[in-house]
Regions:
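Buried hydrophobic positions in well-ordered alpha/beta secondary-structure cores of metabolic enzymes
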Residues: 19, 89-90, 173, 199
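DPxDG-like acidic metal-binding loop motif
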Residues: 75-129
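Generic detector of well-ordered alpha-helical packing
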Residues: 43, 66, 86-89, 120, ...
Length: 242
């Protein structure tokens, strides 16, 4: 695993070094058929990371949000697989907010090899094999896709946040800054895979489509409903507030 940990660190450095070029493309916006934004920064960063990985991982099967085609392979195969969302939370990003992230998950066949979450403008990252500083919270984070379950969850009381970035939510539920993260409408593999694998590594309770998640590959051709709870009982001296 050690060489791959080094590779993930190098990807983080690659993104950090590219940040000025990414930010320079922030407000060059186009609109997808579903009405969501995509910026030149999304395209630039996906192309940069894909090229860098292809030079280092032989016969790589690359799955990226901005380049994935519906006719492409959707099941894991022998060899290296990379699943990337170059800028998760594009609406935040192109609005000038700093709560956006990079999500990368690497697999060898059906076996997870390592994952990385980055919050580049906030200067933070989380990756496979690295320790995390755990905190505690009573906040539930919700996805920004409006769904009746979100409205009822907020109406039922308690602290709730809609933060507009799956990477930010996944990063924070893994370390305990969110007690729970819920996306009842569903998100794509590139939005979720790195984050759910890191949450799995750190002992969170994870439900995908209503079933316990055991760390399997998520196909890129469909959406997944996710519910993650931080396990405060697994680290001493911590517990949910309230």
């Amino acid at each position: 695993m050690q060489p791959l940990v080094s590779l993930l660190h190098d990807v983080r450095t690659l993104v950090e070094d590219a940040l000025p070029s990414v930010l320079a493309r922030r407000y060059d916006i186009r609109w997808k058929p579903d009405g969501s934004p995509v910026t030149e920064a999304d395209i630039y960063l996906e192309t940069l990371i894909a090229g860098w990985l292809n030079d280092r991982l032989p016969d790589l099967d690359f799955i990226g949000e901005e380049s994935f085609g519906k006719t492409e392979r959707v099941e894991p195969r022998d060899g290296w697989i990379a699943v990337l969302d170059p800028i998760d939370g594009t609406e935040n990003f192109c609005s000038g907010l700093k709560e956006w992230g990079v999500s990368l998950s690497l697999w060898h066949g059906a076996d997870h090899a390592g994952s990385l979450l980055m919050l580049p403008e906030l200067g933070d990252a989380m990756m496979t094999g690295n320790p995390i500083d755990r905190v505690r919270s009573r906040i539930t984070g919700y996805s920004s896709s409006i769904h009746p379950a979100i409205l009822s969850g907020i109406a039922d009381g308690g602290e709730a946040r809609i933060l507009g970035c799956a990477v930010y939510n996944l990063f924070n539920v893994t370390r305990g800054a969110l007690a729970r993260f819920v996306n009842p409408k569903g998100a794509q593999s590139w939005d979720l895979l790195a984050g759910v694998m890191l949450a799995h590594e750190h002992g969170c309770d994870i439900s995908i489509d209503g079933k316990a998640y055991e760390g399997t590959f998520l196909r890129p051709d469909r959406r997944y409903r996710v519910d993650i709870r931080h396990r405060y009982d697994l680290h001493s001296g911590q517990g949910p507030i309230g």
